């Protein structure tokens, strides 16, 4: 038997209204709240949000517009609503706390769009890492993987949504593709395992980025145009290239859409999709990015993530 656990008040999968995993199966609903104590003011917020999801209301936004902060008697559990300037200041303060060196889940910035996640990662890294502008990746950088990569024995080297610390780093030019970048060993935040070396593209090198796109485009065309008996081999060559030359940034088209998605990102901010199910000591939610698009209109659905 297979038991699946879900929450119909969470954000659905991208481009899906509901999860297919829960269609046409026997289900049981658990209603007791256990993740927040009864005296935790955050519990009120989550109950309002859940009600808004079910009823199509905006009670959560109305509530935080009237109640700018609330804490329990110990002043250790609660929330504060900030304006943009205050939020930035608080972000720098929280990520400068020594607690994050012992617990990388101590604090996260949570945004709706991938663009906002990238902007926050850049802002935080430049705020807390000395000389961060000198290199796209440095020793002790906090990195989140957006992909799972396995070795020849099908054992995971890095896993999707897991956090890693840069353990060792060296400048490197890929011997096969002649792309500039860095050879990096990561250490898993949870478990402490050190990975085998992985090659990361230096996205500040314009020639390297142009050649990356050319190689990837050529390999895709070769696979699409290949005879049926060798098509699988051609696609394997493309994915071998992708996994051996990892990206820290998205590569976009002129119209703003994404051509090639990043494989890794700095681990200070996270999308609301990826954050679901996680627990942080301090959650810094970019409500404006979640509620409004760049034109000041509410997001109609999850497909608007960019």
Annotate each predicted stretch with a short phrase.
Residues 5, 9-160, 165-224:
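Conserved helicase motor core of P-loop NTPases
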Residues 177-306:
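C-terminal accessory regions
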